[in-house]
């Protein structure tokens, strides 16, 4: 582990290699054929750096409770490229993860009209407006049992061996060409994601942006060095809106999505449904032994 004093994203990128990662992760990266380092580690967090952690107003990734975004496109989940929809809803629920209060987001994946995965995701913002990912509780449909299972859960600060680490999903002051940085890591589930700002100042057409045009778009590349056949995802973030498009190169799933709807759903039946789903997932997680989500 690095020092418990958290440093800024800019300073963190000066670290050599993934020093905070275990030998297990380094070995896995080498076996995957990736040149070390895969991404620069970030120092361990300090809760004091997250004084207003749930007021997430990062220009490129604002998380305002009640906001629901729907992205539609195609993805290959083993049966060819099929219609795929992701619904991303910022709730008013919060949870303490690794000593930091986080915003809870409900993420629902639907393939050909059938729910394939439903997830609680946990985000927080530091004093420099970097938005951190602190963990995920996903339930995935299991064709063998006809039910949902949860094999890929991770929370920062938790783990049977080395504790998982939070990472920066969207930087607060992005600049093109910065080094690959850690987005999240868990040895328990062989999870490691890295991100890099690829382009700035891009323009995209989308009806959910002012006058149908998204300006000053940031493009971030994401990859998983542990995936033997993993490619690169490109995520497009528009100021004041958030994620507006996803593309992929060399990725098996070849997920391509565009934002088709964005609304404040508070006070609606859909809002009630979302909160009921969140409560249900909390109960499931607690029943499965993830005490962090127990009352």
Per-region residue spans from a language model:
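Bacterial N-terminal signal peptides that target proteins for export
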Residues: 1-11
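Bacterial N-terminal signal peptides
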Residues: 10-23
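Signal peptide processing junction and immediate N-terminal pro/mature segment
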Residues: 21-31
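Conserved functional acidic sites
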Residues: 31-295
């Amino acid at each position: 582990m690095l020092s418990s004093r958290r440093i800024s994203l800019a300073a963190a990128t000066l670290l050599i290699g993934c020093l905070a990662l275990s030998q297990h992760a380094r070995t896995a990266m080498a076996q995957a054929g990736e040149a070390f380092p895969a991404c620069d580690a970030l120092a361990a967090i300090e809760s004091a750096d997250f004084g207003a952690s749930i007021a997430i107003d990062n220009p490129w990734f604002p998380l305002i409770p009640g906001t629901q975004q729907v992205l539609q496109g195609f993805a290959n989940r083993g049966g060819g490229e099929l219609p795929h929809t992701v619904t991303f809803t910022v709730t008013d629920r919060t949870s303490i993860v690794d000593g930091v209060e986080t915003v809870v987001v409900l993420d629902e994946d639907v393939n050909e009209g059938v729910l394939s995965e439903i997830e609680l995701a946990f985000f927080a913002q530091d004093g420099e407006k970097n938005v951190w990912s602190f963990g995920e509780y996903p339930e995935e449909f299991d064709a063998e049992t006809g039910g949902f299972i949860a094999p890929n859960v991770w929370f920062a600060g938790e783990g049977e061996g080395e504790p998982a680490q939070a990472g920066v999903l969207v930087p607060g002051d992005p600049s093109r060409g910065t080094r690959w940085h850690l987005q999240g890591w868990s040895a328990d589930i062989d999870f490691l994601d890295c991100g890099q700002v690829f382009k700035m100042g891009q323009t995209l057409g989308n009806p959910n942006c002012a006058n149908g045009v998204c300006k000053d778009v940031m493009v971030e590349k994401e990859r998983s060095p542990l995936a033997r056949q993993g490619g690169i995802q490109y995520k497009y973030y528009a100021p004041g809106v958030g994620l507006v498009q996803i593309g992929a190169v060399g990725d098996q799933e070849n997920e391509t999505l565009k934002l088709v709807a964005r609304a404040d759903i508070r006070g609606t039946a859909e809002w009630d449904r979302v909160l009921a789903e969140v409560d249900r997932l909390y109960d499931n997680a607690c029943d499965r032994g993830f005490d962090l989500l127990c009352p």
